[in-house]
């Protein structure tokens, strides 16, 4: 999901804004079997949360908001005026994953779900810098001993060089109708993502979420058996 601006290219920001405003992803997340499994896994992980900061929410809850006493969901195109559309324990706010303005050290859990592959810049190499910054921003909002919960789609390490090489033409395609309005994205191998998180937090859990028959690929339903992309859940803790 979208959620940053400083390290993202203007095209990435605008395409993310337009895509998620149309709620294409949210429609698929509500009905595809893989997303049902992901929602169950994330809901279980968040059970008993007090104050949850959901960064890059995109207007889509990858969990049952009732599991937390308070939820603050932020993204670039969300606005506080939208809060009445959601459960009473949910507050909606405009927010940037790379430049959060929420108070430091005030949340026991920060969730960043399917955010990182959207944090693309003009070059493929910008993604790593953006993700590292997003993790740092999330860490700052955690109280001592708080947890960062990451849900992310990752590719096999062997395909990462190819994906990076294909990123420039993918950016060009994102300017056309061929991607259906979906922004150019770039997924990391799970080992690289774990390494970026471990630079700043202590990883306590890293598991693959089993997929069903269908996933979303560039926002469209796609057979899971035909894509190398897999969903991972990582839980990391800030020092007490």
Residue map of PLM features:
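Core SAM-dependent methyltransferase catalytic element
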Residues: 200-202, 216-240
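Class I SAM-dependent methyltransferase Rossmann-like catalytic core
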Residues: 2-45
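C-terminal alpha-helical "lid/dimerization" subdomain adjacent to the S-adenosyl-L-methionine
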Residues: 151-216
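A conserved beta-strand element that flanks and buttresses the S-adenosyl-L-methionine
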Residues: 111, 115
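A short acidic, Gly/Pro-enriched loop at the edge of an enzyme's catalytic core
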Residues: 98-110
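A short glycine-rich, Lys/Arg-flanked "PGG" loop and its adjoining helix->strand segment in the class I
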Residues: 128-144
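Class I SAM-dependent methyltransferase SAM/SAH-binding core
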Residues: 53-100
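Short glycine-centered segments of the SAM/dcSAM-binding site in methyltransferase folds
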Residues: 51, 145-148
